[in-house]
């Protein structure tokens, strides 16, 4: 009972802090709230999921693979880390006309080649999976594009709410976090079609990464034993990955390991690993 009161109190304090901080944020840095910005009448939205008659007040994303299965669903005896770099090429179109209903028969505002795979760990087995994709040019080189008003980048996440039946948890908490810290991932609701079949409501999200418009840190110079860094709590890999020696691992406080995502495995040194671990 006491722990429940503590958790409730922390949530209330977090909400109050976000409210107070939002009143003092520079208007130019005010986080865009998608649900407060759309004025198209919801009743005009078609309830049909047929691509010929479908329409939505939300952005619509169409992905075409030519019938090729998107890789990433784990098979029997296969480790998640074995397939995290398996991508296929596909075509993506995004329909996002401000003040209009979005239809697949309309002119897309964005059209690009992408490399795409299924993302997640246990969520890879869900009926509705999430995706990670990267914009590319016709030659397969990554390129940065603006998506639904969010900062340009090449790598994006399509989160498919499955266990969260409200469909709001990640969208709500990312936006709330963004009112407190501007580097929290930006998000937009959208509706997704895959090879002409409706997949449901998704959340288009920025991937947590170092760079302009994402987490803007001091770039590692490759020489110093001190660096800005990003770590990821993840399941242990079967690959040769050096994990951090830290309290969470030897005290078994989390079911996973902490892996350095930036500066990255190819640039990490024993001295830098020790610095980050401390």
Regions picked out by a protein language model, each given a short descriptive name:
Residues 2-278:
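Phosphate/dinucleotide-binding and metal-coordinating scaffold of catalytic cores
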């Amino acid at each position: 009972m006491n722990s429940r009161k503590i958790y409730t109190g922390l949530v209330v304090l977090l909400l109050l802090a976000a409210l107070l901080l939002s009143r003092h944020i520079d208007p130019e840095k005010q986080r865009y709230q998608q649900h407060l910005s759309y004025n198209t009448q919801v009743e005009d939205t078609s309830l049909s999921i047929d691509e010929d008659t479908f329409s939505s007040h939300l952005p619509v994303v169409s992905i075409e693979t030519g019938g090729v299965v998107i890789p990433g669903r784990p098979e029997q005896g296969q480790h998640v880390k074995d397939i995290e770099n398996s991508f296929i090429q596909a075509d993506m179109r995004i329909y996002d006309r401000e003040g209009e209903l979005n239809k697949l028969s309309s002119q897309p505002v964005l059209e690009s080649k992408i490399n795409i795979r299924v993302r997640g760990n246990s969520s890879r087995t869900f009926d509705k999976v999430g995706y990670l994709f990267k914009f590319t040019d016709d030659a397969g080189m990554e390129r940065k594009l603006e998506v639904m008003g969010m900062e340009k980048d090449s790598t994006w996440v399509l989160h498919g709410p499955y266990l969260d039946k409200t469909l709001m948890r990640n969208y709500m908490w990312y936006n709330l976090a963004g009112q407190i810290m501007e580097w929290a991932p930006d998000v937009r609701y959208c509706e997704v079609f895959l090879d002409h079949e409706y997949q449901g409501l998704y959340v288009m999200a920025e991937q947590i990464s170092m760079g302009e418009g994402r987490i803007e840190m001091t770039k590692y110079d490759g020489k110093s034993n001190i660096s800005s860094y990003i770590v990821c709590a993840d399941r242990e890999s079967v690959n040769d990955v050096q994990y951090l020696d830290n309290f969470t691992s030897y005290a078994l406080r989390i079911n996973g390991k902490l892996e350095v995502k930036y500066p990255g495995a190819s640039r990490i040194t024993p001295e830098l690993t020790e610095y980050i671990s401390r």
